[in-house]
């Protein structure tokens, strides 16, 4: 099949994939609960002749095609939605209150199923496995699937993610680290409660927390190599009980992102030292808990430059 024939083949079922994507968008499912999505995927793949295995990594689906003894190339597709209320007013908006495909996984599923239709007709001399992964948004599904053997036998694995900042028909590629490693940061600031009119008799945990929030951002710019950037964002803060009482305790929850593996491996220790120091400067104590969630995506140079042919879909 030459390129023109390939494009005609894609065009022949493009409307089918668009309708499929919109159906998935209307019926989103949260991480680990992708049961109906998995049924839809499995049925589609079985109908076009793929060997399908279900309930891999809980709600995941994997499908094989071609001569698996000649090496297997994998394509990974995520399929969970987010706990977000959709307000787009699209004709195919989410029909599930508080759940939305806001990260593009509905598109990823459609892309994966479209690839499955094409591969069936290419007569490749190696095997192909498409991995439909659950629970990407809670950074758990990949581990579940690996534990259940989803990657066994793979020689290479490919992936894709839609990116709204790129024009339609454009593919963004980069050698080495692309998306950053992710970690979860929990900080408990402990002070000493007291009356708001007599702050000198207590230790204001909210003041200490504000020092931590602003101070850690300043520390990043002065103490870490700017060529290996680190992003720290506190997304949740909780503390205090009354408007006129010093807060005894404040909890901060945030995320840490970094593309350099060595920096990421050491960032937990760095955060503990610097956050503790900032809290201590206010007379407070800090308990710092850092958890690595996912490593950075590292693009292999040998697979990267393969002359992709983008299509407007």
Language model features with spans:
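Histidine/acidic-residue-rich, glycine-tolerant segments that coordinate divalent metal ions
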Residues: 62, 82-84, 89-100, 106-107, ...
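A conserved active-site cap/scaffold subdomain adjacent to cofactor or substrate pockets
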Residues: 245-260, 264-267
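Divalent metal-coordination and catalytic microenvironments
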Residues: 24, 75, 105, 145, ...
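Single conserved hydrophobic/aromatic residue that forms the stacking wall/gate
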Residues: 305-313
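Acidic/His- and Gly-rich active-site-bordering loop/insert found
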Residues: 2-101, 106, 110, 114-125
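Flexible, glycine/charged-enriched surface loops at secondary-structure junctions
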Residues: 34, 220-231, 278-290
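Oxyanion-binding "anion nests"
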Residues: 263-280
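A short beta-alpha structural unit
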Residues: 60-62, 233-237, 286-304
